[in-house]
């Protein structure tokens, strides 16, 4: 159930819907090029919307889930066309495919903390920054 809610929220392209999965003071750590931390639903919503705006046709696919108590590990693939700038990465119309893993600590049905791990070099290469 958790993974289908996650997929539906991300694939809705609505940052507020993604943020609604988090506890009021839930924390999202994006760990790739450098760690970025978003605390609270408002920050999570903004961060999610920036991703969804940069890749407006993006699709999140869950490839595997492991659950143990209040911890859930989700292996995923994110695909989309990089249309708008994302931070220092220019949107050039290139297709992006990122594989990653998210580790969630839940408080009941809500995300208390998420640590997102993905390959930053793949994103940089797709944006034309690397080879």
Spans of features found by a protein language model:
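C-terminal and inter-domain tail/linker signature
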Residues: 1-131
